[in-house]
Amino acid sequence: MNLYENRLEELKEEFNYKSKDIAKYFKANKSTYSEWEHNKIPIPTRRLIQFANFYKVNIDYILKLTDKKVNINKGTELDLKLIVERIKETRNKLNLSLRALGEKINCSFSAIASYERGEKLINSDILISLCKISNTSIDWILGRI
């Protein structure tokens, strides 16, 4: 399975949108949007939230981590404090140190520490890996459910 696999193209077609219109709406470069849509590059975490809010679905569904499509009608803003708490809770549930978690998800322990301190938003690649090893929903970690 491609780490970047997603349903952006499928959702776009379901709603009868064109790629150029979606790119324009989100103020994204058309070629960048195309790379996201065709699984060439990871979708940044902030964009994942925007796409999920736009299509009113769960991020886990967009990223093909589940086939269960959950309608989420309320738009969700980033709550970095909640995300920080949930990342820590997930790591603690796994009973792993920062270094051990980093080794499992191919991320430096210092990057994980900065995510846990709220210094920066967790990278989508790392978020996907964390959710896969912990069997946790991305939507839960990001405070959408």
Question: Which residues fall in each region the model found?
Answer:
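A short, Lys/Arg-rich alpha-helix, primarily the initiator
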Residues: 1-16, 70-93
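Residue-level detection of the helix-turn-helix DNA-binding "recognition helix"
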Residues: 13, 27, 38-40, 67, ...
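DNA major-groove recognition helix of helix-turn-helix/homeodomain DNA-binding modules
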Residues: 46-61, 125-140
